[in-house]
Structure formats: C-alpha cells, structure tokens
Amino acid sequence: MNRAVCQVALENDEREAKNTWRLVFRIAILLLTVMTLAISAAALAYSMEASTPGDLVSIPTAISRAEGKITSALGSNQDVVDRIYKQVALESPLALLNTESIIMNAITSLSYQINGAANNSGCGAPVHDPDYIGGIGKELIVDDTSDVTSFYPSAFQEHLNFIPAPTTGSGCTRIPSFDMSATHCYTHNVIFSGCRDHSHSHQYLALGVLRTSATGRVFFSTLRSINLDDTQNRKSCSVSATPLGCDMLCSKVTETEEEDYNSVIPTSMVHGRLGFDGQYHEKDLDVTTLFGDWVANYPGVGGGSFIDNRVWFPVYGGLKPSSPSDTGQEGRYVIYKRYNDTCPDEQDYQIRMAKSSYKPGRFGGKRVQQAILSIKVSTSLGEDPVLTIPPNTVTLMGAEGRVLTVGTSHFLYQRGSSYFSPALLYPMTVNNNTATLHSPYTFNAFTRPGSVPCQASARCPNSCVTGVYTDPYPLVFHRNHTLRGVFGTMLDDEQARLNLVSAVFDNISRSRITRVSSSRTKAAYTTSTCFKVVKTNKTYCLSIAEISNTLFGEFRIVPLLVEILKDDGV
C-alpha cells in the first residue's frame, strides 16, 4: 500500500513541474510578443515620421484637395471625349473630302503633266483650286420640279478683274472670247485708233485658273498672258481651253467685212496656242482646200470646246455662188416661231422670206452659212482640220456662235443676226470628227435688240443682218440630262444696244433680273459661263460684257460675277 501511495505522490509532483514550465513558457512568449510589437511600432513611427493626433486635423483638407484633383482629371477627360467626338463626327469627314479633292487634283495635274511630257510641251498643266473640282463644265442644277425662274442672280460681286482695259480715250478693247475646263482661257482684240479700224490690231490672250481667297472669295488668276502685237491683223478670234494650253482660231483680215464677201478667195485663218510655258505658236490653215467653197470665213467669236481629243470651233461666212457647198443648201430653210405669238403672214410668203434670209443684200447676196471646224489637238498645230456644214433645214443664217460642253451634252449657240430674236442653243453630237446639229432649244424672253423688221419682238421671217452676240449658258437640267434653263446677260431693248440685265431663263420667261447700270447705259457683246464651288455648294455665273466707257475707250470689257440664288417661295 505504501508503494502505491508513493507512486501517486510521484505522479503528482511530475504533473506540477510540467504545469510550472508551461506557465513560464507562456509568460516568456507573451513578453516576446509585446516586445516585438513595441519594436515594430517604434520602427514604423520612425520610418514614416508618424504624426501626432493633433496633426489629424489636416486630413480633411488633404482629402478635399484630392477630391479637387480627381474632379479636374475627370473634367480633362470630358474635354478629351468632346475633342474625340468632334474629330470623328465633324472634322474627319471634312478632312476626308478635302483629301479626296486633293488626290483628284493631283491625279488631274499628273495626267496633264504626263500628257505634256509625252508631247514635249515642257511644262506641267496648272489646275484650279481643289474647291472647284467637279464644279466646272458640269450640270450645276439638276431639278425636275422647281420653277426654273425661281433661280435668280444675286447682285454683282466684287472680285479680281482679270481683263486689261484701254488706257487712252482712243483705245478699244472688243470681242471677248472665253472658255473654261481644266484651265480658263480668255482673249480680246485691241485697237489703238477706235473700234471701227480694221487695218491693224493686237490680240490679247491669257491662261489662268480659278482660285479661292483666304476669305473664301472667288477670283480668276491669270498665270500666262501674251499681247500679239505684230504685223498680223487677227480678227474674230475664238479661244478654247485644251490639255495643251489655250487654243485659238483667228481670221487674218486685210479688208472690211463687205469687201471680204465680195472677194473670190477665202479668208486667211490661223490656229494658234498659248502653252503652259507661256510660249505662243501658230500655224496658217490651208484655207484654199478647207474653205475652197467660201469667199469669207470667220471664227464665231464665242469659245470653242475640247471634245474627243479635238478642239471644236464655231465658224460662219459666205459661200461661193454655185459651189458644191452652196448648191447643196439651195432651197433649204427653217422657220422658228415665237412662243404664243404666231406670224400673221401667209405661209408661202413666210417661206419665201425665210429662204431670202440666208442671202442678205449687205453681203452681195452671198449665202451666209453656219459651220463647225474641228482640229486634232497635238503638238502639231492645224492638224487634221475637218469642216462640218450643217443643213439649213436646222440652222438659220450663219452668224457668230459658241460651242459649249456641259456634262455629257454639247451645244452650239448661234447669234440672232437674222430675223429670230430669242436665244438659240442647238444640241450637238459628234462622230468621226464631224458634228451634227439638232432642233434647238429656244428661250423666248432672252432676246436681243435689232433693227426693224428684225427687232427684239419680231415674229416673222425677214432678211436681216442685225442683233448682237449674247450667249446663254446651260444651267438647269432635268435628271434625264435634258436642258430646262439657262443663265445669260442680255440687252433688254427693242432696237438699241442698251439696258444690260442678267437673269435665269426657261423656254418662256425669265427670273427676277440684276441690272448692270441704268437702262440707258450702252453695251454690246456678252459671254457667260457658270461653275460651282463644290466645298460650299454655291453656284456662280460669270458674264464678260462690253460696257460703254466714254473716258477710256468706247468700250470696256468687264467680268461680272453673280451667285445663283433660289427663291424657295416659288
């Protein structure tokens, strides 16, 4: 039993010893933990320079500052978002359009320069500003429904005058001719001793392009010009813009018009060109072959047109009696009638007078014939000339004129030198270097003054040599490309060359007008051309007009510029 008691006592002692060391271990661990925390806190405070509780007052201020910075950053991000939207939605499409225009401009320029290099022209072709690409020689207003006369010209706009004026009282500048395609070409005649002198004159010829000023204004920039002051008396010149420069057709005159019609040989003619390098060259045409049936032959004064690698000029003059060309027209005539104003004369009498209208007494009874001359455009001037004589069952008595191309359509304007006063535009088709004319568009309110019995209101066939050159420019088209209306500047008087007004015309009536000056201001020839600034979608028309200028010369040639507006109430 004592042994058992001893065994129990020994186990109790061992248990107490274990508990004592366990307590010591726990206390030691606790002390080490507290020391570790204290050391760590001291180290952290030292490394971060921890603030005292009194410093916590500045924390709200710091938070407020941080909030301000975050708000500012968010505002900056909104600005960036706004700029991105503006760039994507607004600026990028405009930049893309401008890039497209520049590329098209470059392609056009490169095309002409390649052509010039191939033809040894020695100079690249200038081109219009990109703003005009797609706006020259195109159908500018395509509208099936609006009243044509709801389109009307603005007041005349100030722009750079690219036409030289007389500098003395006896100086005379007359007979302007203008054409525009890849460039624009202009020419007029210069006489030092009054407008009626036929013995000697100069010919001014210029080449240029359309520009847009920094403020958005349209202006015509002259890049090359020459004054042909030599022994050659060039008259009745027509000009055309071609891929090689400004091509010009002139007659060389040594006598009056009446004397020329009474002669037996054709009038000398010359084909010239002002190149992009500023050099002018010309070549005499073989008129004895080309105009063998003619006694007098002149360019139509109005511009020509570049079509199918050829330049097409209007021509008119007198046929040699009994020549093949003359006999081929014998008995042929056409009668055009005024709108809602029928001639009261007997039909047989009208036919007799219509036939006689082709042989006016002023030119000795010679048949005055309309024609069109085409010349191949190459470095060789006067190459492959082809003369087309349209039948007088389509055309009236031969007169000054103009060949125009608008879109894919070609037209011949014929001055109303005969009995028919309203402006005429013959649709023209070309094939195998020759032209075919078709029944004309007529514009009843677009008249010209004339001597009785062929005054502005005339309605019956008669034999006359009268009128004035005032060409219409095709402006408003149907969607099927047929012509609806034209722009032009006319002399609004029965008999006198007075009262210059601009308007848009349909086949019957005209729009509101823009008057050049007072109704008593003298004027003469006008030639008009329209174009569009594609960037702004604004349509402009240029009328080059001879206007009386009593201080310096009898006439001053003035380029009148208008914008075409729309009256939405019509």
Swiss-Prot record:
Disulfide bonds join C172-C195, C185-C246, C237-C250, C343-C460, C454-C464, C530-C541. GO terms for biological process: symbiont entry into host cell; virion attachment to host cell. Residues 1-26 are intravirion. The chain crosses the membrane at residues 27-48. It is a single-pass type II membrane protein. Residues 49-570 are virion surface. Signal peptide: none annotated. Its EC number is 3.2.1.18. Residues 124-152 are annotated as: Important for interaction with fusion/F protein. GO terms for molecular function: exo-alpha-sialidase activity; host cell surface receptor binding; identical protein binding. Keywords: Disulfide bond, Glycoprotein, Hemagglutinin, Host cell membrane, Host membrane, Host-virus interaction, Hydrolase, Membrane, Signal-anchor, Transmembrane, Transmembrane helix, Viral attachment to host cell, Viral envelope protein, Virion, Virus entry into host cell. Residues 233-238 are annotated as: Involved in neuraminidase activity. Glycans are attached at N119, N340, N432, N480, N507, N537. Pfam families: HN. It comes from the Viruses. GO terms for cellular component: host cell plasma membrane; membrane; viral envelope; virion membrane. It is found in: Virion membrane; Host cell membrane. Its main location: virion. It catalyses: Hydrolysis of alpha-(2->3)-, alpha-(2->6)-, alpha-(2->8)- glycosidic linkages of terminal sialic acid residues in oligosaccharides, glycoproteins, glycolipids, colominic acid and synthetic substrates. Mediates the viral entry into the host cell together with fusion/F protein. Attaches the virus to sialic acid-containing cell receptors and thereby initiates infection. Binding of HN protein to the receptor induces a conformational change that allows the F protein to trigger virion/cell membranes fusion. Homotetramer; composed of disulfide-linked homodimers. Interacts with F protein trimer. Interacts with host CG-1B; this interaction inhibits viral adsorption and replication rather than internalization. The C-terminus (head domain) is involved in binding the cellular receptor. Belongs to the paramyxoviruses hemagglutinin-neuraminidase family. This is Hemagglutinin-neuraminidase. It comes from Newcastle disease virus (strain Chicken/Australia-Victoria/32) (NDV).
